[in-house]
Structures are given as C-alpha cells and as structure tokens.
C-alpha cells in the first residue's frame, strides 16, 4: 500500500493556505494543529442558543455523495449551515447520475450553477484529487471519503477527540483495530498520528486484513489482540467492510469477534483511563461489545460532536484559501 502523493499546490494555495482538503498526506504538523485549534474555537458555537456564525454567508456548499453516509453527510450539512452557507445536498441515487450522467457531467453542471465548494464522497480512490486537479480547480473541494484511500475529516475529528481527552500526542500509545485493508479511516488516522508526533501507533488485525507495506506508515503490526492492546491509551475500532471484500478474507463474523472483538475483558489490558473510539456505523457483536460501546471508556458520541466542529474548520479554512488564491491570480494577471 503506497500513500497517494499530493503535490503541494493542489491542496494549498500560493500562500500556503488550505484551498482543498483531499488527504492528510503531505500536510505539515502546523497546518493540522491549526485545523484542530480552529475546530476547538467552533465547539463554543455549538453550545450557543443561536448556533451560527456568518463566515460563509453568501457562499454555496454542495454535498455530492455517491456513497451513502448519514453521519458524514449530516455533519457536513450542519457545519455549513452553522457557518451561514447555503447548502445543497445531491442525492445521487435519485439524480441524473442514476440515469447515466457521469461524475464529470454532474460536477460541471453544479459548477455552472456557481457553487463555491463541493463536498464529495465517492467509491473510487482518488476521485477528489481528480476533481480538484482536472474538473473544478476554481472550486474548493473537500474529500468526504474516496474508496479505500482517504477520509481526512474523519481523521481530523479523531485527532481532535484524542487531543481533547488526552491533551497531547507526545507520549501516547494508540491502537487501530480491525479491517485495516479496506479502511480509508485507518489510512487517514495513521498519517495524522504520525504527523502529530504520536510515538506508538499500532495496528491490530488478522493477516488477511492487513495491507502489504503498512509498516511504511510508521506503525507496529500485531495479529494478537491481547498483545496489541497492552497498556494503550486509545483504541480505535473499525468495522468490517464486507462491501469492499472479495474472496474468503474471513472465515466468519463470529470467528472475527472471537479473536478481534473488543470486549470488556480485552479492554482491561489497556490503561485504566483508555478511551474507545469508532468512526461508525458500529456492528455490535462483530467488532465491539455493547458493554464497551456504551461504557465509561467510550467517547464515540463525542466524536460525532467534534466532527461538526472539524468540518466547520475545514470548510471555513478552505473557502478562505480558495478566495485568496483567486485574488492572487487576478492581481498577477493584470
């Protein structure tokens, strides 16, 4: 598995500001920290009686989801609305795409309607990069998840969750458990943790669900839950992505749970104050026990709350960077 290389100008404008948010690969620690700090400031907005700020007033954000995701779509909608943007959500299953219109056609038609930003979720790895580079370079593109490649806002909301509960990344042990092979969340989390200075990143999975070359992300690989969870501070569970699996990668879900399910007994091997995370949707009794998902170590619902703040931060920063780049281009064209 090789992380997709991201050219600096594609995600960042000439001033080094975010103008698209496609992947965490290649982004500096300072920029990730700025996103986290900005999201922290937006958490206060969610606690107000009137949950709005005027940063994107007059702007139009289009959510274009070619894959279903209630949680991600809803939090992007809320984030844009809290920034005072006009929001359009395209239900692809009932749109022209179901009648044969391509991704390219759909986005160019939306661009012609003067949209300022697209949040795109697509089943093909690299779709967001393609759109930003070749289809709509003058529109801010946010990757809402593309194939197995990346889910950068999920990665950042997970980092915000960890930072708010643990303070910093400097002395942490973090275990990512489950279907690493098919998980764009795992890839984004590994990149973010490494960039933010986490010294002990572990992946725990059966060999059939580990990508070739995963060690290049700076992780330690475990195929035994008891060994992998020993004294960790954070446990990030992943669901089995049956829809992306081909062939007999697993004997059964029951066998997976027996060997890799997070139970109360297994969690006892982690640190006493360990937190348990999950990007959702949760498959209870497959990757996690209900007593753990609903227990005192779980911060799963906090992740949803923090997700709105992270997406507010990314939307506002990318829109600002895209606007600054347009002004820069206009000034230099004169």
Curated annotation (Swiss-Prot):
The keyword Transcription does not apply. Carbamoyl phosphate binds at residues 71-72, 121, 151, 154, 280-281. GO terms for molecular function: amino acid binding; aspartate carbamoyltransferase activity. Keywords: Pyrimidine biosynthesis, Transferase. L-aspartate binds at residues 99, 184, 239. PANTHER family: ASPARTATE CARBAMOYLTRANSFERASE (PTHR45753:SF6), ORNITHINE CARBAMOYLTRANSFERASE, MITOCHONDRIAL (PTHR45753). This is Aspartate carbamoyltransferase catalytic subunit. It comes from Pseudomonas fluorescens biotype A. The lineage of its organism: Bacteria, Pseudomonadati, Pseudomonadota, Gammaproteobacteria, Pseudomonadales. The gene is pyrB.
